[in-house]
A protein has these predicted regions:
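Acidic, PIN/NYN-like endoribonuclease modules and their adjacent C-terminal/linker elements
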Residues: 1-10, 123, 129-151
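Helix-adjacent hinge/juxtasegments
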Residues: 65-93
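Active-site neighborhoods of divalent-metal-dependent phosphate/nucleic-acid chemistry enzymes
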Residues: 93-132
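Short acidic-hydrophobic, aromatic-tinged amphipathic segments that line or gate anion-handling sites
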Residues: 91-95, 149-151
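Short active-site oxyanion
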Residues: 50-53, 89-91, 130-132
């Protein structure tokens, strides 16, 4: 399976934020993108692609677990929660008041785009952490000026 669509646009270590849609594709065995996302994560684990560090946030974990409970099984949802929270490879970012306020500003600025609160929170967090690449199967991040992986 080719993963060239996942290669970073820069050389060297590239921080990557993990969106709900990317994690859903990885954890749900019947997701359309499951095999390519699994192959991509295998390359991260072996170090053959330079994405590091990996980030996600509590809003993504909430969305992911809720989605997996309804679209997969409670046991898959629990496995995803446990693997993300216990992972030494993924930094779980907890939200704060300043990010929450910044999301309010972003919602107002992009009010005609229908971008979700969670996606705005991801973008605000990514900018704060100087992360440009996001693993997502969601076009909203391009609207927000971020680099979506896979391309």
């Amino acid at each position: 399976m080719t993963t060239t669509r996942f290669e970073p646009l820069q050389d060297g270590p590239t921080p990557l934020f993990l969106d709900t849609s990317g994690l859903f594709a990885y954890f749900h065995p019947r997701a359309d993108e499951h095999e390519e996302t699994k192959a991509f994560f295998d390359r991260i684990v072996t170090g053959s692609t330079p994405y590091r560090p990996l980030y996600t946030n509590t809003y993504v974990v909430d969305e992911l677990v809720t989605l997996l409970q309804s679209k997969a099984t409670p046991s898959i949802a629990w496995e995803a929660f446990e693997r993300i929270v216990e992972s030494g490879a993924i930094e779980l970012v907890y939200e704060n008041e300043s990010r929450f306020d910044a999301v309010g500003d972003a919602l107002e600025r992009y009010d005609d785009h229908g971008i979700s609160f969670t996606d705005h929170m991801i973008a605000v967090t990514m900018r704060e952490l100087n992360v440009d690449h996001v693993l997502a199967y969601d076009g909203d991040f391009e609207t927000l000026g971020l680099t979506v992986v896979p391309r």
